[in-house]
Amino acid sequence: MAELLAPAGNTEALDAAIGEGADAVYLGLKSFNARLRSSNFAWNQFESAVQAVHKLGKKIYVTVNTVVEENETERLYRFLSYLDKIGPDAILVQDFGVVRMVQEFFPRLVMHASTQMNASSAAAVNLLSKEGIKRVVLARELQGEEIRSIRHNTASELEVFVHGALCVSESGLCLFSSYLGGKSANRGMCTQACRRYYETESGAGAKEKGYYFSPNDLQLIDRIPFLAETGVDSFKIEGRMKSAEYVGSVTAAYRYVLDHWREDKEGTVAAGKRMLATDFARAKTHFLFDGADSSKFLNPDQAGGTGIYLGKIDAVRTEKAAERSAKAELSGAADAGSDNAGVSATGLSGSALAGTGSGSGAVQKFALLKGGSYDPESGDSIRIHKKDDSGRVSYKVQSVKKFANAKDRQESWISVPADASRGDSVYLLQTKSMTKRYKRVLASDLSQFRLQPGGERLPVLDLTPLQKETLSFFPEGTYIQVSTVSDLYAVAPEHPVRFIIELNTETRRSLIDKKEALPCGKKQVFISLDPFCPPKTQTVLENDIEALSALGFTQWVVNNPAHIALLKNKNVRIIGGSYLYTFNRWAVSWLENQNIDAFTMSYETSLKNLEAIFEGTQRSRMMICLFSYPALFRMRFTLPESYDFSWFADKEGMMFRALSTPDGSFVMPEQPFSIIDRMQHLRKIGFSRFLIDMSKTAVRRADIKVLMRALYKGEALPDTSRFNWKDGFYSAVPLRAAAPGKAPKAAGKT
């Protein structure tokens, strides 16, 4: 019987998920999980939850699905040791370092590969299975037939998202939020750049605004029969940041369909859809399940938040609690002050924002809504979006009052937060009537649950010592990466020590079909593989590898576990690409065990972290990117034809470029990442391989000359970004100091 897996972002959602029939729940604790903005579980709550859920014959999974920096590995070790003692049914992992640490020290912990690991083909799933990962959460971007193909080619357990919010970017590959301030999606700190309001300018010069990258919500309830017949092991509902009411209603609908579709497929699905009508989330989509028509899941006119649209605030007025007098504020001038007030996006309680002052002199603000089809009632939950997109706040309506308008007709005014203003949009999240009480899962007395992570020391891990011939294929010097053969010719006069060229539709045609001449020998070329590798790509790639190898191309840059599997036991040399994340020494060690000895830095990393991972001669294994226009969004579809713009800007005026190609769509920043002026310092501290990444960029000789001149003179380039190079990831969790004492040694390469 397939498993129904529901989210538990807090204890109330846990109660709802179990109460509505989920077979398993997944939850996070206060760190190392990809939803740090949800409430998550305290240590005693988690221990109680594991005990209680197991008594009910159900399962509980813990998210450990973020990348981990080197200075966090000891805290990770203590956390895994704690989980090993508590005994959840599995942990969800993204970082290869977590996999390596579990393999070494905690073999009892069952591992599931998070969707953030970007496993999207049978090759990737089978490689991870051999590494001890029992289940893989497949990438959301897969089509139905691709899921069926993977099922037919692996014995591993497969988990599929069937309902909830979507990321516009391919799983685990979004850099946008991190670029904007270090709040990385790979660290559970995503600020949802895809949900933001952007201004565009078309080729004709017309300016428009919209939510251009905010996808609708996934709903595959009518595809449950197909997925069940395919043999999917677990049906996953997204929503660790959603309310208990949402979790309960969605879980109930999918429970019903899973239990009854064999009796009456059509009628059961129809009933399930009716049950989902109250989830009050965004408009629904099958996303890419049936094909890649982006116009069906991107709607620039739809606000990035969830809920049923209730209209805009047409007028506001205030009323003192003790006096029944009301003062209308119908002019734009009256709202000028509150328009500039900051609105929290973290969902503050209504009582904290409802009025000013206290007691009999307290002031309550009321709003008149226009443009919707439903009048909220007292007790309903709403979300208010500021008209300038400066923030959003969730609020429970405290009261509804009737006031006469100019024509002496009674109109309903609802209480709103103090900084709500004319022009703000209002959405219904749930009605008071939806509120449902569930039986408590956790023990009423949590004092008996006292386990917490201890003070264990993480054994020291030494990377494999370098032999003289280990890096013979990876010489010191400057590497230049491009996207086309013509770009190879543009950069060739700069005489890089090696060239890297992306394998894409155009280069496949140039290298394999046309066998075009190159400005260099094939031994000077690395072929870089795209980080997203679904079944269709895997099939093509297997043929490409054979064809290119026969032509003399034997050096590769790999960016997905599938690439490792496809190149295994072939006479090739491999560099780990920037999307095979190596944020800690344990991840490097895991990749060493896959016979990868050279690496490319992730665009999100910092100098401090690289210095901590690689010491002494080990630094010669890491290629440092000095310049790039990093892909902030990587999307598995072409943008809608109506998107007739190349550039767009956010409300701060930062500019970004949108690019659609036969291989997908990309968003790049106007300001490139650059640390070109730091090369000489990096050489002094032992790093000696450097990358100039010009991929997905129109390469011009003049630009290359400027870059190389700055490189050799050690000059900083204007109008560029350091990304996270100096400050690293934003962190809301302070690190605890390590206990004194000497740590033991860990095993090296296995």
PLM features: residue spans?
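Active-site pocket-lining/capping segments in soluble small-molecule metabolic enzymes
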Residues: M1-A119, V137-E141, E146-K236, M241-G332, ...
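Conserved nucleotide-cofactor-binding alpha/beta core module
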Residues: A122-A123
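Long, basic N-terminal domains or extensions that often function
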Residues: G132-K134
